[in-house]
């Protein structure tokens, strides 16, 4: 009560934040009349002035009003787009390192240009992060024009670029790219053998588009670079063959003489828990598996791997559905992103689950992989000095953004009032009744011409609905992972009169749905592409035709059919005589294509404008959801496709008690309410109690998923600190500064390790383990301890430690004289890197094994998290000891042969780089309980540890 009164008097935190920014908006608007008078050159010159002021120590904050005003003026001149006042506020929120929640259609892409330009002035780099390569390329080409016009450089990072192209893109003032590419580049850099090969700069400022998708939906997906193991794949087929012979059972509660008065019993061979996404064998099931696999005890430690793969095979059959969780294409299992409905080529589930699904579908089984480098998105993005983000739906996860990323969410008001009514949910008892009602509503709205966007949660459901619409003779487009190639094109035209579009989840996110159609999109359809793509096609065709050595007339005729209107340009170039300047020809062809394209856009503008008015009169775009998602945020994203920029629209969800969300999390309560109300078959219900029950079910799932993400980051924070130590050590070695001092430090610590392991205080020296001491000293340092009885009597822990150190220094001095300074420094550098990389790889495997079993500590009344921290620390310290020992041992024992062998030794480092040009696509697993995304080194690729050998002969043994 008191809190509500205070809020009424002083406003909410969000209102106070917005109130603080409006005066700055006024200052920006006051600068506009003066900037309008400037020529393009004078406007561009402002950037040089800002850079000069920044170099003299002026802060970016103080330059914000002027820089934003300049950026807005450039947007008007280059794109014909002027930032609205609310977009200026969005830009300020991003610059201050917060999340801007802006509704769909409010121009988030344009907003990002403001903080990007301001922070780009510093020259320290700005990363604009998007969810896929298409958006990264589109935004860099589109919005990048503003930055280029103002004199800033723009780069783009997409899959398939060479290292030199990536380095150039990262060196730009503003770099567009995907979260996966940024993350993998960081991991790849930290596996390289030369600092000059690094592609990334220190992390300065990141603007994350669709921040909820990247920082929350993908937060359970670690990025992993991995190499294959030798394991046979036969075991997956053998286990898969027995799963259909097992009978699914149920958990039954029976009366019992216990504290709760109830006891659980199990029927069948296995039970399934859909909430936890797990499947477990019953006692009967264990006996049956043992009989089928001809083993005595499934729980014998020697059979743990068989048990693990049996459980994964159970999950594959009982919990993962084809055309829902994955599709099979060209004998390959491809994961479907549960949040976007997009296919994720190259991504794989971990811990043998993907192999189990491949066996189930009879697809080719790929080997499991071993981790070489890994990081989560949470820890990657927390490395930026300043992080910000924008999305249409962040407020429901505001608490998580604040707790994990220290990011506050500011809700930006819409430029025009939202006119979209969100109608109450309609609930039916069965899915059949629900789909009948959905088809009825689609038919009714389609007949009057109102465009409809139908949201489904899986490919299976979208195709089922499509079949029903075909039977009714209703024309429609289906947009799911199987038809993703034309995604942006289909979504852009979903607002045309009479259009019916079925889309899985948030497919097409990032593309605006314009009522009446998009003139640019229609022009692209008529033009068969963009001016850029058509020009690329033309140049390829022209060069191919030239090679046929045809007469000029035939040459022009052969191209005229496919590229009408371009021939006068080509003829003009040919008449100039001499060699054809292909670059000049390409420029002129692009200009002609742009002119033709603009004519098509102009032709479509009045058509789309007239259709826009018709669609507005019909009520705008209607969103029809066929199922609630686990997250309210995903439902809000679907609704947000309608009602953009003050346009009318509407939304409604149709549900049934057979939907996954209600069936797993809320069915009993909802079913009880419906029974009490006497709902008959075919009859729908819209009731506040039902809506609240559904929201409570969603909140339960959201809380559960938040706990999983929080749990993951708490565990990964331990690894993050260890990763920082290793990567910092690698960078120092690559920097070459004081590398010999680093080695002597390791040598001194190695002596300390031996003393700590074998020397016992307050115990006579004769009782020490001298066999262990002499063997270890001989193995590590390469010299023999000459011990006499007289010496034994005089040895103390202190003088023994000092004697060992002195002898080790003398031995190192001998090696230095033998090799010379330059060669010794080079040997130290290469050996240190090879040993660190090999030991780090083994350490990651040990950590994976530790994670798998740590949960069992809870049964011993121990906190698994604390146990994990303690054990992970011990594993790390053991690894550091092994690194010291192995580096010292190799330096003291290494032999350098002929000059030819030394040249081969020099070649070992560059081979390390080759692996990154040969790897497959990154593999990030979707959010099925902590899963992994992997990018693998092939069996015959150079080993990522840098040895110069093939992977199968080195770390892949």
Swiss-Prot record:
Organism: Geobacter sp. (strain M21)
Bound cofactor: record note: May bind 1 zinc ion per subunit.
E.C. designation(s): 7.4.2.8
Protein name, entry field: Protein translocase subunit SecA
Cofactor(s) named in the record: Zn(2+)
PANTHER family associated with the record: CHLOROPLAST PROTEIN-TRANSPORTING ATPASE, SECA INNER MEMBRANE COMPONENT OF SEC PROTEIN SECRETION SYSTEM
Domain of life: Bacteria
Region (Disordered): 924-957
Top-tier EC class: translocase
Binding positions for Zn(2+) per the UniProt entry: 943, 945, 954-955
Pfam families, alphabetized: P-loop_SecA, SEC-C, SecA_DEAD, SecA_PP_bind, SecA_SW
Chemical reaction(s) catalysed: ATP + H2O + cellular proteinSide 1 = ADP + phosphate + cellular proteinSide 2
Subunit structure: Monomer and homodimer. Part of the essential Sec protein translocation apparatus which comprises SecA, SecYEG and auxiliary proteins SecDF-YajC and YidC.
Alphabetical list of InterPro entries matching this protein: Helicase_ATP-bd (IPR014001), P-loop_NTPase (IPR027417), SEC_C_motif (IPR004027), SecA (IPR000185), SecA_CS (IPR020937), SecA_DEAD (IPR011115), SecA_motor_DEAD (IPR014018), SecA_preprotein_X-link_dom (IPR011130)
Keywords of the record: ATP-binding, Cell inner membrane, Cell membrane, Cytoplasm, Membrane, Metal-binding, Nucleotide-binding, Protein transport, Translocase, Translocation, Transport, Zinc
Bilayer topology: Peripheral membrane protein
């Amino acid at each position: 009560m008191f809190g509500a009164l205070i809020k009424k008097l002083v406003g909410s935190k969000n209102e106070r934040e917005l109130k603080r920014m409006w005066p700055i908006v006024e200052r920006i608007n006051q600068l506009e009349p003066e900037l309008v008078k400037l020529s393009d050159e004078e406007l561009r010159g402002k950037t040089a002035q800002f850079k000069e002021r920044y170099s003299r120590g002026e802060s970016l904050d103080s330059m914000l009003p002027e820089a934003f005003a300049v950026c807005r003026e450039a947007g008007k001149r280059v794109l014909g787009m002027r930032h609205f006042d609310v977009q200026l506020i969005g830009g300020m929120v991003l610059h201050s390192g917060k999340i801007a929640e802006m509704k769909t259609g409010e121009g988030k892409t344009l907003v990002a240009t403001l903080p990007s330009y301001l922070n780009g002035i510093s020259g320290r780099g700005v990363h604009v992060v998007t969810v896929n390569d298409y958006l990264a390329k589109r935004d860099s080409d589109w919005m990048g024009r503003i930055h280029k016009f103002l004199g800033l450089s723009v780069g783009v990072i997409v899959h398939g670029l060479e290292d030199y192209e990536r380095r150039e893109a990262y060196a730009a003032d503003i770099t567009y790219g995907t979260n996966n590419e940024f993350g993998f580049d960081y991991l790849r850099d930290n596996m390289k053998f030369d600092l000059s090969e690094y592609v990334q700069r220190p992390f300065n400022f990141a603007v994350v588009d669709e921040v909820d998708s990247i920082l929350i939906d993908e937060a359970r997906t670690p990025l992993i670079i991995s190499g294959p193991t030798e394991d046979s794949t036969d075991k997956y087929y053998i286990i898969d063959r027995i799963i259909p012979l097992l009978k699914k059972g149920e958990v039954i509660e029976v009366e019992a003489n216990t504290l709760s008065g109830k006891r659980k019993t199990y029927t069948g061979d296995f039970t399934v828990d859909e909430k936890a996404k797990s499947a477990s064998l019953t006692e009967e099931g264990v006996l049956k598996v043992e009989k089928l696999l001809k083993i005595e005890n499934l729980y014998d430690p020697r059979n743990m791997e068989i048990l693990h793969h049996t459980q994964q095979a159970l999950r594959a059959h009982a919990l993962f559905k084809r055309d829902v969780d994955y599709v099979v294409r060209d004998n390959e299992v491809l994961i479907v992103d549960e949040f976007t409905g997009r296919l994720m080529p190259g991504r794989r589930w971990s811990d043998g689950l993907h192999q189990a699904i491949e066996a189930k579908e009879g697809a080719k089984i790929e080997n499991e992989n071993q981790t070489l480098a890994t990081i989560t998105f949470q820890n990657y993005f927390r490395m930026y000095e300043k992080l910000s983000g924008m999305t249409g739906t962040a407020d429901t996860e505001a608490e998580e953004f604040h707790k994990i990323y220290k990011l506050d969410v500011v809700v930006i008001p819409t430029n025009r009032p939202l006119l979209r009514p969100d109608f109450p949910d309609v609930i039916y008892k069965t899915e059949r009744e629900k789909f009948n009602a959905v088809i009825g509503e689609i038919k009714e709205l389609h007949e009057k011409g109102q465009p409809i966007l139908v949201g489904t949660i899986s490919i299976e459901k979208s195709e089922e609905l499509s079949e029903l619409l075909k039977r009714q003779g209703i024309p429609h487009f289906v947009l799911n992972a199987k038809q993703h190639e034309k995604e942006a094109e289909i979504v852009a035209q979903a607002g045309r009169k009479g259009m019916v579009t079925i889309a899985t989840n948030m497919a097409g996110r990032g593309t605006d749905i314009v009522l009446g159609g998009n003139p640019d999109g229609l022009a692209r359809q008529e033009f068969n592409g963009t001016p850029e793509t058509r020009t690329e096609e033309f140049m390829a065709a022209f060069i191919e035709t030239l090679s046929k050595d045809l007469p000029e007339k035939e040459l022009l005729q052969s191209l005229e059919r496919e590229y009408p209107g371009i021939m006068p340009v080509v003829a003009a170039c040919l008449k100039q005589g001499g060699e054809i300047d292909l670059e000049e020809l390409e420029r002129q062809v692009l200009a002609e294509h742009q002119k033709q394209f603009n004519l098509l856009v102009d032709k479509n503008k009045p058509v789309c404008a007239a259709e826009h008015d018709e669609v507005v009169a019909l009520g705008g775009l209607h969103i029809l959801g066929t199922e609630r998602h686990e997250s309210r945020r995903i439902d809000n994203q679907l609704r947000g496709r309608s009602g953009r920029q003050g346009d009318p629209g509407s939304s409604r969800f149709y549900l049934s008690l057979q939907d996954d969300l209600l069936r797993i999390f809320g069915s009993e309560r909802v079913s009880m309410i419906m029974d009490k109300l006497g709902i008959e078959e075919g009859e729908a219900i819209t009731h506040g109690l039902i809506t609240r029950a559904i929201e409570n079910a969603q909140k339960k799932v959201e809380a559960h998923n938040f706990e999983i993400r929080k749990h993951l980051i708490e565990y990964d924070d331990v690894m993050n600190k260890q990763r920082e130590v290793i990567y910092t050590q690698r960078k120092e070695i690559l920097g070459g500064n004081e590398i010999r001092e680093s080695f002597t430090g390791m040598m001194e610590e190695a002596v300390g390790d031996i003393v700590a392991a074998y020397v016992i205080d307050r115990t006579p020296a004769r009782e020490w383990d001298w066999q262990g001491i002499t063997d270890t000293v001989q193995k590590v340092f390469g010299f023999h301890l000459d011990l006499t009885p007289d010496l034994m009597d005089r040895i103390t822990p202190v003088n023994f430690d000092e004697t060992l150190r002195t002898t080790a220094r003398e031995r190192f001095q001998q090696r230095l004289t033998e090799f010379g300074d330059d060669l010794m420094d080079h040997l130290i550098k290469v050996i240190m890197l090879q040993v660190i990389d090999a030991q780090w790889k083994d350490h990651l495997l040990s950590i994976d094994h530790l994670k798998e079993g740590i949960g069992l500590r809870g049964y011993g009344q121990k906190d698994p998290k604390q146990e994990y921290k303690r054990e992970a620390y011990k594993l790390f310290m053991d690894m550091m000891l092994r690194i010291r020992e192995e580096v010292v041992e190799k330096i003291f024992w290494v032999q350098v042969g002929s000059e030819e062998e030394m040249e081969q030794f020099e070649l070992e480092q560059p081979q390390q780089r080759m692996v990154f040009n040969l790897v497959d696509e990154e593999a990030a697993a979707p959010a099925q309980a902590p899963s992994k995304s992997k990018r693998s080194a092939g069996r015959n690729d150079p080993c990522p540890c840098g040895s110069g050998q093939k992977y199968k002969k080195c770390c892949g043994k």
